[in-house]
Design a protein with these regions (language model features):
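Long, low-complexity, polar and repeat-rich extracellular regions
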Residues: 1-247
Length: 247
């Protein structure tokens, strides 16, 4: 098995025009770092029982493909602080049984998805955007934190047996079915804290819509309404704040 100690660094204005594959039991005791104006045009794939400690996209770096970790392989963390419009343009998929921590303050163009038995921790902060939404279809537990000024588009979907905990002070968009949070699985979803925002032009609340066959297993602990510019009539009906859950 191949073993590499140290980081793989793509820096300045260097470009990697193909996929990066860590496979066949290879071990990278360090990380893949894309920094400066570095660009990686292909995908990053960790497969075949291989491992790498981390993937970092920083500076004005751009990764144009997706990041995939296959079953029995290992990636501990992904950090995206890139200020480029591209950021990481593809999806991030963890099929493994190894916990993955994702920290984003830049742009992730695709979906973040966990399909395996591993836990996943997602922190979206400092104006970060996750355009493709978040999906948990495996058995690993997922923790999602979306900070003020940050955005998750296309909703949060649970279709496995995992426990998912959500804390949201930012913006979470709706999926194609109009749901903010969907539970179609046998797992549970706990909304630990959620700030409901107000449309500054209309005064309407951005209602949290909970849907899916398992919506009865979505529990809300704390919900706060940002009342700046709110039409007070909106506050008369709890369904303007959150709908689809037992109240």
């Amino acid at each position: 098995n191949t073993k590499l100690e140290g980081n793989i660094i793509n820096a300045d204005s260097a470009s990697i025009g193909s996929d990066i594959k860590i496979e066949d039991g290879a071990k990278v005791e360090g990380g893949l770092v894309n920094q400066g104006n570095g660009s990686i045009s292909g995908s990053v794939q960790v497969s075949g029982g291989s491992s790498i400690d981390s993937i970092t996209n920083t500076g004005n770096g751009a990764i144009s493909g997706s990041i995939t970790v296959d079953k029995d392989s290992k990636l501990d963390s992904i950090t995206n602080t890139s200020t480029s419009d591209t950021g990481i343009s593809g999806s991030i998929t963890n099929n493994s049984d190894n916990k993955l921590e994702i920290s984003n303050s830049g742009n992730i163009g695709g979906k973040i998805e966990s399909t395996g038995s591993a836990d996943m921790v997602i922190s979206n902060s400092n104006g970060g955007t996750i355009s493709g939404g978040i999906s948990s279809s495996g058995s690993g537990n997922t923790s999602i934190s979306n900070s003020q000024g940050s955005t998750i588009n296309n909703g949060i979907t649970v279709s496995g047996s995992a426990q998912v905990e959500i804390s949201n002070q930012g913006s979470v968009g709706k999926d194609e079915n109009g749901n903010t949070v969907t539970n179609n699985g046998s797992g549970s979803v706990g909304i630990k804290d959620w700030v409901v925002s107000t449309d500054k032009d209309t005064g309407k609340l951005d209602t949290v819509v909970v849907g899916g066959s398992g919506k009865d297993n979505v529990k809300v602990e704390n919900i706060t309404v940002d009342q700046s510019n709110v039409d007070l009539d909106e506050l008369d009906n709890i369904n303007h704040i959150i709908s689809g859950v037992n109240q």
